[in-house]
């Protein structure tokens, strides 16, 4: 999980964990045929979890961190259908992978930071059945993933979801001819461009322009017509 499995009992404190172990990812995996300038296709086939999730919030963390002066931790039992919250609520399981991607171009990027390589995107659409495409910056792609959640809301408001160790089964396919600038996701209902930036406004601009480039280049549609269609059926999240 994102804490490196360091929170296992109610006595474990986030004040005492090794923060260098935060957001670990399994990898890197060298993918034969993946070349710099191409893309890597990643299909999420299955996600399985351990039997316990750790949740947390604290001072200066997340949206409400100004209200707290210490860390708070909750441990939640997990089964194949629900996450049990505080022995009061059964939350339906919503498996997703928080950290997923390939090696970035240039200097290393820690697993807590998102970018064009993927990384800590914390996107709830990254779940079983989804297919992602990443721009490859170095030969072999060097794929990795981790930071899984058994349930998490969009925005991860308190700084952590239901952080849960487990196993992801994925299928990796090299696409050396595909050119993309940022991660792309598709599932049974949606086609999604994903962008990361210093501000939400900047990220939204990049994602929309990426979508316009992809759709127009593949369909031959006029940019003004497609932009109007975006206003009718497109969503920015």
Language-model segments: residues:
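Short, charged beta-turn/beta-strand-edge "cap" motif at the junction between a beta-strand
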Residues: 1-5, 46-50, 137-142, 236
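Alpha/propeptide regions of enzymes that mature by internal proteolysis
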Residues: 16-17, 24-43, 52, 127, ...
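Short peripheral tails and domain-boundary helices/loops at the edges of structured domains
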Residues: 15-36, 59-87, 152-173
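Conserved mixed alpha/beta catalytic, RNA-binding, or beta-rich assembly cores of soluble enzyme
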Residues: 93-120, 124-201, 212
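Short acidic, glycine/serine/threonine-rich loops at helix termini
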Residues: 8-9, 52-57, 144-148
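N-terminal, Lys/Arg-enriched amphipathic/low-complexity engagement segments
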Residues: 1-17
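DUTPase catalytic domain/fold
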Residues: 2-7, 36-37, 50-53, 79
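Intrinsically disordered, low-complexity linker/loop segments enriched in Gly/Pro
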Residues: 24, 46-128
């Amino acid at each position: 999980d994102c804490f490196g499995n360091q929170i296992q009992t109610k006595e474990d404190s986030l004040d005492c964990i090794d923060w260098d172990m935060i957001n670990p990812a399994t990898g890197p995996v060298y993918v034969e045929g993946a070349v710099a300038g191409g893309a890597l296709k990643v299909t999420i086939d299955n996600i399985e979890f351990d039997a316990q999730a750790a949740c947390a919030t604290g001072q200066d963390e997340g949206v409400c961190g100004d209200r707290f002066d210490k860390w708070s931790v909750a441990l939640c039992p997990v089964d194949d259908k629900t996450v049990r919250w505080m022995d009061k609520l059964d939350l339906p399981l919503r498996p997703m992978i928080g950290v997923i991607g390939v090696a970035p171009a240039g200097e290393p990027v820690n697993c807590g930071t998102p970018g064009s390589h993927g990384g800590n995107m914390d996107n709830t659409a990254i779940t079983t059945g989804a297919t992602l495409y990443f721009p490859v910056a170095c030969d072999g792609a060097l794929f990795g993933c981790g930071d899984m959640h058994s349930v998490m809301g969009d925005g991860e408001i308190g700084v952590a979801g239901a952080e849960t160790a487990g196993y992801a089964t994925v299928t990796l396919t090299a696409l050396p001819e595909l050119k993309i600038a940022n991660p792309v996701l598709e599932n049974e209902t949606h086609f999604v461009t994903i962008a990361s930036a210093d501000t939400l406004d900047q990220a939204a601009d990049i994602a929309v322009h990426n979508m316009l480039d992809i759709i127009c280049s593949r369909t031959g549609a006029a940019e003004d017509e497609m932009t109007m269609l975006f206003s009718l059926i497109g969503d920015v999240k």
